[in-house]
Amino acid sequence: MPSDGRCWETLRALRNTSKGRLRYDREWLLRYEDVLEECMSLPKLSSYSGWVVDHILPNTSGHTQESAPSSDNSPSSGSASGLYQSSLLKSPVRSSPQSPSPSSPNGTQSTHESPFTEPIAPQSSRAIKVEGCIRMYELAHRMRGTEGLRQWQEEQERKVRALSEMASEQLKRFDELKELKLHKEFQDLQEVMEKSTREALGHQEKLKEEHRHRAKILNLKLREAEQQRVKQAEQEQLRKEEGQVRLRSLYSLQEEVLQLNQQLDASSQHKELLSVDLAAFQTRGNQLCGLISSIIRTTLESGYPTAENQAEAERALQEMRDLLSDLEQEITRASQVKKKHEEEAKVKRQESQVQQGPAPPTQTSAPSPSPVGAQNEDLQVKVQDSTMQWYQQLQDASAKCVLAFEDLTSSKDSQTKKIKMDLQKAATIPVSQISTIAGSKLKEIFDKIHSLLSGKPVQSGGRSVSVTLNPQGLDFVQYKLAEKFVKQGEEEVASHHEAAFPIAVVASGIWMLHPKVGDLILAHLHKKCPYSVPFYPAFKEGMALEDYQRMLGYQVTDSKVEQQDNFLKRMSGMIRLYAAIIQLQWPYGNRQEAHPHGLNHGWRWLAQVLNMEPLSDVTATLLFDFLEVCGNALMKQYQVQFWKMILLIKEDYFPRIEAITSSGQMGSFIRLKQFLEKCLQRREIPVPRGFLTTSFWRS
């Protein structure tokens, strides 16, 4: 139809325009969703819709009626018109009022003006048809785009669903693979654990087998060891029984030797009858007693006596018997000689009755000194009578002091007990605090002890204490103070030799102001260390052996005697304290006042020790300790006489000590010998270590 041809021409003309040559992107919908949303939004009326209704629609209806017959023949035109009308109703006019109108039939163009200025001339039917075609094209294009978009969306949804399903399936496969992997790892781990368990069980079985094997071997060894132990125990028990038998035998031998020695001492009443010196028999008897005592001490330290020890003791006993037998023979012979002399004298008296005056007395010559190394006849074991009287007086004074405060110590009253404890602490604690720290500190301790003994109150344990709290307080404090001084020598000085001097100077100062304390110090010292007298206690008939050992200074606990080394250590400490006391005076006291127990007592002690038979291991130890502490002071006091005594020790006393000292006890003897030889070589006794100088008292 002519109208269709014109439409296509119009379309070709439009395609040749600048806008028609524009290329449109088919995929714009994916990138410009906002444009699609704008197209799908509800239509809005243009500002020219009112004008179109007033001017275009009336004219359009007239043309429609005129072309109705032709419309029947041209369905495409009708449809186009319908579409056009519908497009007018659904969408606003796209062209602006200023857009140019289609060309007129005569080829001229008319310009539309604004409806607000002047009315626009209605378009021709051709223009309307063209515009309708355009709108129909746009509608068709829009429908195709919408359909394509819908299909694309459906396709995308299908793809998304497919991808989701695929991802879900992949996730399931991943979970299955993971579960499979975990299951496999668990199986591998279980296999490894089972393998390890099997290996461990195998190793355990192997260890059990080795353990059973070793246990079997060990049981065999244990049985062998048990058999060996039983055998050794039986041998030890047998040896112990034999040793106990030998020890009892040694004690019996010692008791018999001591009894024989007493018989020797009892023979002194026949001294006037004997032509020989009785001291030689007594000296040898004492040596034999000391020999057996040293054998017993040595065996107690080492265990039990051996057969050689018993044989040696039996030889000593036999020698003692022979000695007593010889003495008895000498006494018998002397008695016979005396009887014969008496008979001759009787005859002579009868013959000389006619003679006037008695016969001149015979003079006895003085004994000549024995050569070095020979048996010295004037040495003895017993102490001098005057010394024994002095010793006994001190012990009696100590016993009276104990009786004086017996009510205080035995009281059941709590207040009295408290007073006793406070007094004991006030007396003993200051002595325990004595040291070489400073002279001022030592003076404070001395003043505190002096105040306590003087009846003044002193502070002890945060309380005020005085001896006036109890009538027996002073005796109790004096006794405990003296006991503590000696105990410090027994313990502190024995371990630290330098401690002898500060303790001794305080004791010496207290002794000068309170003489009773000094006597009690000597009593305690003599009781614990009889060698400080010097006094060698004798074994008496009927005396228990333990009591005799206590008299000698040994500590006996549960029938067990202390070791010899510990015994010598305690004796050494007390002798050192005694040697320090006799040479020191309290520096703050009266210098003109004589020492209550000075160096003259040290000289007496040394002389009496040298006049007595030495004891194995004891004499050498105590001589060394005494001379090391007090030798310098004695040298300055007695000078030449002191060196004569040192030479006497070296030349005459050393051989005696060496004769009774066994090979295992030579240490103390060698130490004494080297000390004296060095002193004789230097012609000086060195100042003892720890001696308190004048600078100490200024500290």
From Swiss-Prot:
GO terms for biological process: nucleocytoplasmic transport; poly(A)+ mRNA export from nucleus; protein transport. Transmembrane segments: none annotated. Residues 67-98 have a biased composition (Low complexity). Residues 340-351 have a biased composition (Basic and acidic residues). GO terms for cellular component: centriole; centrosome; ciliary basal body; cytosol; nuclear envelope; nuclear membrane; nuclear pore; nucleolus. Its main location: nucleus. Residues 1-29 are annotated as: Interaction with NUP155. Residues 62-123, 334-374 are annotated as: Disordered. Associated with the NPC, however it may not be a stable component of the NPC complex since it shuttles between the nucleus and the cytoplasm. Interacts with nuclear pore complex proteins NUP155 and NUPL2. Required for the export of mRNAs containing poly(A) tails from the nucleus into the cytoplasm. May be involved in the terminal step of the mRNA transport through the nuclear pore complex (NPC). This is mRNA export factor GLE1. It comes from Mus musculus. The lineage of its organism: Eukaryota, Metazoa, Chordata, Craniata, Vertebrata.
